[in-house]
């Protein structure tokens, strides 16, 4: 569910599978600028950051 070694630990690829334990956490989507959350087993964008950047941590808590 990560985006590869070139990406930060706070990023997840939108629509990729996620672990159930991450369901209440928010990461930065690496396909586009937005916040993703685990919904229905996949990382789903819940907030579009638009022209703003997304900031996050390795254990979730991402915000625009």
Curated annotation (Swiss-Prot):
* Species for this entry: Penicillium brevicompactum
Q: Which InterPro entries does the protein's record reference?
A: Bubble, Bubble_sf
Coarse class of the primary localization is secreted
Cross-referenced Pfam families: Bubble
Name the job this protein performs. Answer: May act as a toxin. May recognize a molecule or part of a molecule with a negatively charged surface potential.
Q: What is the lineage of its organism?
A: Eukaryota, Fungi, Dikarya, Ascomycota, Pezizomycotina
Location(s) in or outside the cell: Secreted
Protein name, as recorded: Bubble protein
Keywords, comma-separated and alphabetical: Disulfide bond, Secreted
Q: Record's Gene Ontology CC terms?
A: extracellular region
Cystine residue pairs: 3-30, 18-38, 28-54, 49-64
């Amino acid at each position: 569910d990560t985006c590869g070694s070139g990406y930060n630990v706070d990023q997840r690829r939108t629509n990729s599978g996620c672990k159930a334990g991450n369901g209440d956490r928010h990461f930065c989507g690496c396909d586009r600028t937005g916040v993703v959350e685990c919904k229905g087993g996949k990382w789903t964008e819940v907030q579009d950051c638009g022209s703003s950047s997304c900031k996050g941590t390795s254990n979730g808590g991402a915000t625009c």
